[in-house]
Amino acid sequence: DVYKRQGLAFALIALAYTFFARQEWSSTAITDRPTVNMLGGYYSQQQFLRNLDVRSNMASADQPSVMDEAYKEFVMQLASWDTRREFWLQTDYYKQRMVGNSKADAALLDEMINNIQFIPGDFTRAVNDSVKLIAETAPDANNLLRQYVAFASQRAASHLNDELKGAWAARTIQMKAQVKRQEEVAKAIYDRRMNSIEQALKIAEQHNISRSATDVPAEELPDSEMFLLGRPMLQARLENLQAVGPAFDLDYDQNRAMLNTLNVGPTLDPRFQTYRYLRTPEEPVKRDSPRRAFLMIMWGIVGGLIGAGVALTRRCSK
């Protein structure tokens, strides 16, 4: 009877403890890389830069997709200590629990940071990335986890936009240099051609060559014999060249079009989504701690064992 009473007493104490102990509820989310539509304008602009790299042979063969790179940045933010810290600092959940003591508040913040747990996936076992958040109530666990995932995604989008701006500026500088180089080459060829025709025209005038004195096609004549075409033809070629100006190829026209697009600059969307849910956070139906039935059974057994020990000691003393 003693061990039964002891067991019942300990079980009741455990039951009372569960009513006053701080509760812990957890909600879990499972994520994967986003779709093209979720990335919005970021995808098309990043792909535009990649196409420029392909044209200039700067792209690597094993380059990950835009979706993979965006999701990689999201996962980095999701697991980041700084992201978790910044998230809690801006929540009412943390502010309402501050006591005004710097050490106590810092300890509370550390505890909350550890209450967000990122579990990396294992693709060899087809396990996706997941994140769990522990809070004092079921609604808080659900709502805070949704907010945290969105917060991490927004930070990832901000970092990706910064990288896009930097890459865009670098490509603009490269394209300007390339276009300028092509213009200088075309101008040098034009000036050399103009000079050749002008010199040939002077010689033709000096020798009074008024008509063509050769059967060789004009395109096959070396510059030193161009005067044989005669003054009228050379004058016409000179005027035509002056009217047309430097000649540019298709590659130059394409580069000019690309440069015009680059000069406009990227259009940044600060809130594009860098993930998609495979398991959306929900309100948990069972709390993590304290587990009432488990504690009552465990402490009931402990109480029973203590009661049995007390009864055995009394018998031995008699």
Question: Residues of each region from the PLM?
Answer:
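Alpha-helical transmembrane spans of integral membrane proteins, capturing the lipid-embedded, hydrophobic core
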Residues: 6-11, 15, 300-304
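C-terminal membrane-anchoring or membrane-association module
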Residues: 310-318
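Soluble oligomerization/assembly scaffold segments of membrane-associated complexes
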Residues: 75-263
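Short, small-residue-biased leader/transition segments that mark boundaries at the very start
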Residues: 2-3
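Short, glycine-rich, amphipathic interfacial segments at transmembrane boundaries or analogous
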Residues: 18-71, 75, 193, 197-213, ...
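Envelope-exposed proteins and targeting segments
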Residues: 23-27, 127-131, 273-274
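Interfacial amphipathic helix/helix-coil modules
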Residues: 257-304
